[in-house]
Amino acid sequence: EGYIQPDESCLKQMFFRKPGLPILMVEFPDGRRVPYWNTFYQEVHGRDYLGQMDLNIKSEKVWDFYRETLKKIASYGAAIVRLDAFAYAPKAPGKKNFLNDPETWEFLQQIHELAAPLGLTLLPEIHAAYEEKIYKTLADKGYATYDFFLPGLVIDAIENRRADYLAKWAREIVEDKISTVNMLGCHDGIPLLDLKGLLPEDDIRSLIDLIVSRGGMVKNLHGQKNIYYQVNATYYSALGESDSKMLLARAIQMFMPGKPQVWYLDLFAGKNDHEAVRRAGESGHKEINRTNLSASDIEEALKKDVVAKQLELLRMRNTHKAFEKGAVITVAGEGPKLSIRYDNGEAYALLTVDFEAGAYEIELS
């Protein structure tokens, strides 16, 4: 029956998330094998399939599904909807499979028009190098953007004892009024490749090597160069399982401009779970950072100083008036010194960091 042989000029435009072509051959009861677009992973066991299948956004049935899903989410009381990997949705023969312009932004606008009447705010999730300025495009169009630069910048600042790159990014957020949602660890990996154009490439490579040396993992790239990847590790293990570094990182996150979100495993100082990776088998690298915690695990973790102090930082960020809407944020950083200050009326909060000493202080009104 032959093979699908893509034109090399088309392949060069592709942005792959797994080895091989993003195509899954689905066998129908009549014996026909039909190719379906499949950007992300798949498992095939005879006639059984497990994975993520791309939707045809030109189909009215798909838009009916979007409408029903957004209505259901809104009925549950949701306020923010994350659009996971949305930039892979628009594609057409002869074009890229990722971030097509203007189709990507037209698609996002269509989703916005469905979500806004329901009181839903969209949070588009997109990984791209800093140098591509996609975060800026999202901001200019009025959307919040994930701060995928912060996790790597914080590790760089702590390990290399310098505030320069972190402070530069924080100032850009403030000066350009970019609305962000930030994190340290998350359900996926640490997105160091996103730092291209912000951090020197040799330094990015060194950070990847450092985290891997501390037990982190990178998926098997099968020798391909145009595959995006993250470094899979808990943030605590990426920092060498150092309580002081974890607390410093969390303090920086709480003062960083934007809305902080916290991955449960880092809050409880979770370590790389290599046993979970082993149980998951091939392509199970993400399980390193997804350990299931029992109630007793959590009760035991709450006794740890590193957990209690992180919770104190979260309470401060949630309750102190300096962090309320309308605050004026001032960032200064050079060499090993960093300061971030919030002023809101008579309330203020000031973080000062000495990366050389690996220490921080917080002053509150």
Protein language model regions, located:
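Active-site and adjacent substrate-binding regions of carbohydrate-active enzymes
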Residues: 1-364
